[in-house]
Swiss-Prot record:
Its EC number is 5.4.99.12. It comes from Chelativorans sp. (strain BNC1). Substrate binds at Y113. It catalyses: uridine(38/39/40) in tRNA = pseudouridine(38/39/40) in tRNA. Homodimer. Gene3D superfamilies: Pseudouridine synthase I, catalytic domain, C-terminal subdomain, Pseudouridine synthase I, catalytic domain, N-terminal subdomain. One of its GO terms (molecular function) is tRNA pseudouridine(38-40) synthase activity. This is tRNA pseudouridine synthase A. It comes from the Bacteria. NCBIfam families: hisT_truA.
């Protein structure tokens, strides 16, 4: 068997998420159909991050195996041709032949996410579905201060979905930075792995700080409560991007 890695960009808006789901259209299904169309083989691909419905990717990574050897450029171009023909909002940025022990999910050393908040009075037109529109002016400096209280190895029970299937709520958050760029607030989060809904839960809590309703101490207290009920409202999916996966 020949193993291939693909780097993927997609608009999460039209999809029920990355993972294949019965009766719903997923990014995984779209790519698997494209692989079958050009190779004649039915495969199951494994992705580095199982993004939710509406979440985008600039640098998702996946792998799959084919019985026949193919040139990497041919794999990329053939997949893109079939994805385009099918009207999918998915682009294969790169394809590469890799060792058989490479695993897009379990070989990953770090995952990097970006959350975009469009912080302006006027609603979004061109960027609708690409960012969270928040009309009220947010204090990015206060949000960043609170974010630093959440960095490190912690029990993140407060910031994970009740549907999260991870065996342990303990994760090491390597980076959580908040910066303002004009009318946009960018929140960058990095870790080896994340809990389900962790980034969006963190963003929702930081927004409460930015509005002045919470302080950095309140955000830290929410973390220490280890109680989902202590979390701020979960941020919507359209502002979240899987930017890069490190190996």
């Amino acid at each position: 068997m020949h193993r291939f890695r693909i780097d993927i960009e997609y608009d999460g808006g039209p999809y029920a998420g990355w993972q294949r789901q019965a009766g719903q259209h997923s990014v995984q299904e779209a790519i698997e159909k494209a692989i079958a169309a050009f190779s004649g083989e039915e495969v199951t691909i494994r992705g580095a991050g199982r993004t939710d419905a509406g979440v985008h990717a600039l640098g998702q990574v996946a792998h799959f195996d084919l019985s026949r050897e193919w040139k990497s450029d041919k794999v990329r171009d053939a997949l893109n041709a079939h994805l385009t023909l099918a009207g999918e909002a998915v682009s294969i940025l790169r394809a590469e032949a890799v060792a058989e022990d490479f695993d897009a999910r379990f070989s990953a050393k770090a995952r990097h996410y970006l959350y975009r908040i469009a912080n302006r009075r006027s609603p979004l037109a061109l960027e609708r579905g690409r960012a969270w529109h928040v009309a009220r002016r947010l204090d990015a400096a206060a949000m960043h201060e609170a974010a630093q209280r959440l960095v490190g190895k912690h029990d993140f029970t407060t910031f994970r979905s009740v549907q999260c299937q991870a065996k342990s709520p303990v994760k090491t958050l390597d980076r959580l930075d908040v910066t303002r760029v004009g009318d946009e607030i960018e929140i960058h989060a990095s870790a080896r792995s994340f809990l389900h809904n962790q980034v969006r839960s963190l963003v929702g809590t930081l927004k409460k700080v930015g509005e002045g309703g919470w302080t950095a101490d309140d955000a830290q207290a929410a973390l220490q409560a280890r109680d989902r009920a202590a979390c701020g409202p979960v941020a919507p999916p359209q502002g979240l991007y899987l930017v890069r996966v490190d190996y």
